[in-house]
Amino acid sequence: MSAGYHPFSITRYCLLMGLGFILICSQPLQATRKEPIFAKQKKTIVLDPGHGGHDTGASGPEGTFEKNVTLELARILAAQLENTYRVILTRTDDYFIDILSRTSIANHEKADLFISIHAGGSFLHQASGITIYFFNEISESVLTPDTASSKPLETIDHPSDWSNIQNRHQTSSKILANLLQKRINEQTIFEKSEILGAPLLVLEGADMPAVCLEIGYITNPAEEKSLQDISVLSNIAQSIQHGIDDFFEKVR
């Protein structure tokens, strides 16, 4: 046997190489366990507080502006939703944003839901209640001059290519509207609620289930007072949150 020859040196070398290979290969597997490639993604919800800036929307007998009520509710709702969902607001302060940009934001963010928030306005102070709109090319109600809000329900005069986008989601939008109404009716702040289809411009180009919520009539003295109350807005927001949860539970 020649000097320096060790019969087990080759075996040891092979074992060490094998162990090294195993250790190297195991590293990506460990990383994969820590951060799964197919980790569940949060659903994206775009909340659209109506009006803003010079566009005040409707105003109540006590001078409450619709733009302020819609933003306050959107902020409260966003805070309630953000632990479960990715939430984006079309505006976060008192500034103007044109109506077409609102759905553009939702489309750009690839939102799973678009909810536009408004308050009703009427020259008839007794007008009351909550209305949930989904997009429909033919209005299910007569939009009369009683509507005093500065175009909260701006409609399109004729169908366009954009109409076809929201039409694809009409069934899902109706489901969302019904689930929201069910939850809203569980609270007794407002006496009535209804669901209507209308060719609303704010919903027309949304490429996802979308609704427009009119959360009571700000021109009704009693409802204006309710809409000034943070606890009332929090209850409304909670009802909307439950309706959204119900929707994703139903359509998943």
PLM regions with names:
Residues M1-R252:
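Catalytic-site microenvironment of enzymes
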